[in-house]
Amino acid sequence: MGADARSRPGALRGGLGGALSQGAEGAIQWLPTLLRGRPRQRRDLLRQPRSRRPGELWLVSVDASASTRRYGALAQAKGVLATLFEEAYRQRIRLAVLHATGQQAQWLWQGQKASRELQDWLRQLGAGGGTPLLDALHQAAGWLARRQRQKPAEHQRLLVLTDGRLRDWPALPEAACPSLLVDLESGPLRLGKAERLARELGAEYRHISELNEV
């Protein structure tokens, strides 16, 4: 599988602005900020207190099925991920990454601190094959349940990037931690399944274009 788009670590900097920089109050946490809705003014941004840094983990599920090639969807997703990985690396946040493509979702990272190796993987990421997103969500739910038993004080977040182009799916349980679903579906004809998926997961919903408008 070849990479069909380059990741751009600065892709969100124009849109999220200060949400990717550090200020006097501490680093702005853009993922938790987005979980509360689009920030429209400075006071909407959540910052990490400098005096206390509780353990934090971001679990990221990436849909890289063939349909995400359309209209540059994967290219935009890679821009989001490049920035996310860079922010996690700077703040020494732990990551878990699930790659949903082909027949079965695969773990790329499972709770380690962010590393530059993730950027290397991202540069090679291309779209193709089926959409094992349901498998990814089930694996993520099981892994999070075990993680929460092992590390009950850890702050966990789930980020799902997908165009939602599934034929159908059974009822899904709500995610066990604060969650954000980023809809990659673009173009003139949109099925809107990602929004339905977000509702079932109890996740905040954002279209990827919104991340560049903030």
Regions found by a protein language model. Name each.
Residues 164-209:
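VWA/integrin I-like adhesion module and closely mimicked acidic/polar interface patches used
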Residues 37, 87, 125, 143-147, ...:
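Conserved, well-folded catalytic cores of nucleic-acid-processing
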Residues 53-111, 114-161, 165, 183-192:
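Von Willebrand factor
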Residues 1-55, 114-115:
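Acidic/polar low-complexity segments with low predicted structural confidence
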Residues 14-21, 64-67, 103-105, 122-123:
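Short hinge/gating elements
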Residues 212-214:
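C-terminal "exit" segments of structured domains
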Residues 25-29, 53-56, 72, 76-79, ...:
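Charged, alpha-helix-enriched surfaces in structured cytosolic catalytic cores
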